[in-house]
Amino acid sequence: MIHFTHNDLDALGSMLCVDAKYGNKITKVYHTYYGDFEKQVNDVIVDKDDIVIVTDLSFAERPDCLHKLIQNKKYVQLIDHHSYPENFWLEFSKYSNFKHIINDQICASLICHGVLLPGVITENNSVLLKNLCKVIDVYDCWRENDKLFEGAQRLNLWFWTKNIDELCKAIKDNGYKLPSNSKEEIVKLYNDQQKEVEDAYNNKQVFRMGPVTFVFNNYVFNPILIKEMKEGQKLVVCCFQFRNGDFCFKIRVKQDILDNCSLNLLRMNIIGKITGHPNAFSYVKKINNETELTNEYKMIVSEFVKILNDSFPLCSDDVPF
């Protein structure tokens, strides 16, 4: 059995749950950071194992990849929490060897825990693993009003200093608790990060355009995002460039300022589809020159401000008539 997943914190939680369920039946875990998505799909296809469980990966923009997986494997199960376009799943209903479980209200780790683990591991281990998945959920779904939010941010910061496969084993071997030295490491990382944030502001890597803040430092995007929103900014965008020259735009909307209809409209107007998460989505675009890049910034601000000014506090489903 193959496990195909993301490479982030939510993938770690999903891995822990999948491993707890299937153990040694999992022969290999494939990770993608989306930049190599098609390559990893092809690697999974040529792998001799015929059963694939996929977690925390969005196929909203890559339906052909999902078709290829299903057509080349005996059985594929997808557990995911990203948004998908309306009627996306209709074309997949023809496959008898495919099952999908989608819930965009919680992170993939919590879905995996609820779907895979009842009755599988001891109650104590299940509680400990669920507690970890809850912290992951607070980070991955960006629940900024949750009391665990700051701790979740620090957990994610620490996570990116580790090898995901080695960390998964270490947490499992420690009874679904973080390794004993994690607290000291997290404190040091947090203190170092605060200095990096200060440097980012001093080096003019943070720029405001009305209610929108642009951040040109992906490494400290999250702490700057939190700071900016605490100071009243409503949309924060991180812009950085991949090695192949393409630009990535990570967009985060402050919670509770737009209704769901407006959040969907924002995604449609900026990237042309409803994908990612309502308050957090990204897209990649080829930019040829500084003028095009400047126009992209202006477009993001314009679309957001227009929707912000026109936003009505009720979605159509909520209107009581």
Set out the residue ranges of the language-model regions.
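Amphipathic alpha-helical interface segments
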Residues: 155-159, 173-175
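Metal-ion/cofactor- or nucleotide/acyl-coenzyme-handling active-site neighborhoods
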Residues: 166-172
